[in-house]
Amino acid sequence: MYTGRFAPSPTGLLHIGSLLTAVASYADARSNGGKWLVRMEDLDPPREMPGAASHILHTLEAFGFEWDGEVTYQSRRYALYEETLYRLKTAGLVYPCHCNRKDWQAGARRGTDGFVYNGRCRHPGQRPALQGKQPSWRIRVPDRDIGFSDGIVGSYTQNLARDIGDFVLFRADGYWAYQLAVVADDAEQGVTHIVRGQDLLVSTPRQIYLQQCLGVPTPQYAHLPLLTNAQGQKWSKQTLAPALDSNRREQLLRQVFRYLKLPEAPETDRPAELLDWAVAHWDMDKVPKHAITAP
């Protein structure tokens, strides 16, 4: 059975880009007779906004969304992540990293998603002294291409050794890394389809590699075009995207429908009816592949 999900982070409030992802993932799930889960990705407490998680859920309800089952909070799933990391340790796929980020990045080259780790701690004899600090844990990556067929973008491939380097699964500050948590959650929740923004396209080969290492299924992926401001910057919390205004629900939903190339919906003041229209007329093939300017 199709199982999709929407996974916001409570580092801020929902904005127009969040709404586009929510509508697309919801419409794709419901149009395929599937479930739509909501997962709160609250992995990084220092970056979270107090009250954002509950505000996000209330906003989703105000815009007519209905999810299946209970909301999942990553902050309550550490035991799952510990078990997942243990499996990778047992398989000899991960190692402790004692490197200071500033030091290893000083001589590192840039890859697809930031600096490529130089592999210093791969070899026990080369690891610097810890000096009482706990290490991070990295996974060894293969020197081969990992690719997939995206439902919107098409073919996408990375060589993890060349483009990314061994990446962190558990941070030295004691927090779980996104890549491990999202793979563990998707597998445990039986997620079969992931519809999300193209800012996460670059993370997908890492997640597929982790799925292969853990022997869990790889979902089908579709990465949505990003919404950008007049300066070409992605609308986000960092670029001060305004929070969704529940008093403008119909207007904002219709705006997102236009971005997703949905036909114009009939007049109604009920958000749930607008979402039903989106589900009935959903066509992934019509979704644009490239960024959309959203004033």
From Swiss-Prot:
Residue numbers binding ATP: 237
Span(s) of short sequence motif 'KMSKS' region: 234-238
Sorted UniProt keywords: Aminoacyl-tRNA synthetase, ATP-binding, Ligase, Metal-binding, Nucleotide-binding, Zinc
Binding site for L-glutamate: 5-9, 41, 178, 196
A molecular-function term among this protein's GO annotations: glutamate-tRNA ligase activity
EC numbers: 6.1.1.-
Binding-site list for Zn(2+): 97, 99, 117, 121
Cofactor note: Binds 1 zinc ion per subunit.
Residue span of motif 'HIGH' region: 8-18
Pfam families tied to this protein: tRNA-synt_1c (PF00749)
Required cofactor names: Zn(2+)
GO cellular component: cytosol
Biological process (GO), any one: tRNA modification
Function, in words: Catalyzes the tRNA-independent activation of glutamate in presence of ATP and the subsequent transfer of glutamate onto a tRNA(Asp). Glutamate is transferred on the 2-amino-5-(4,5-dihydroxy-2-cyclopenten-1-yl) moiety of the queuosine in the wobble position of the QUC anticodon.
Family that this chain belongs to: Belongs to the class-I aminoacyl-tRNA synthetase family. GluQ subfamily.
Name of protein: Glutamyl-Q tRNA(Asp) synthetase
Organism this protein belongs to: Neisseria gonorrhoeae (strain NCCP11945)
Lineage: Bacteria, Pseudomonadati, Pseudomonadota, Betaproteobacteria, Neisseriales
